[in-house]
Amino acid sequence: MAKKSKIARNEQRKVIVERYAAKRLELKKALVDPNGTDESREAARAGIQRLPRDASPIRVRNRDGIDGRPRGNLSKFGISRVRFRDMAHRGELPGITKSSW
């Protein structure tokens, strides 16, 4: 089980990323625009640097949706590999069966 503070900080980062997503996308488009001038690119670069650090989506950590485990995540299910195995054995995941050959 992850610390509650780590889980809460990650949730706060998700909110910040969502809040600044449109502005960040607009600045990124201006940054790579082939028709833009050097001044507009420099202004876009400065604008991105002025955004909060946590506005970058790369800072959000994928965590287990139940207990917040940060590693071994199966993104398709939103849970960790340990929890996935337990839930699959108990039959709580529809359509998931243990392979046997």
Swiss-Prot record:
GO BP, one annotated term: translation
InterPro entries (alphabetical): Ribosomal_uS14, Ribosomal_uS14_bac/plastid
Molecular function terms from GO: rRNA binding; structural constituent of ribosome
Domain of life: Bacteria
Cellular component aspect of the GO annotation: small ribosomal subunit
Keyword RNA-binding: yes
Basic and acidic residues: bias regions: 61-70
Subunit structure: Part of the 30S ribosomal subunit. Contacts proteins S3 and S10.
Similarity-based family: Belongs to the universal ribosomal protein uS14 family.
Protein name per UniProt: Small ribosomal subunit protein uS14
Species of the source: Clavibacter michiganensis subsp. michiganensis (strain NCPPB 382)
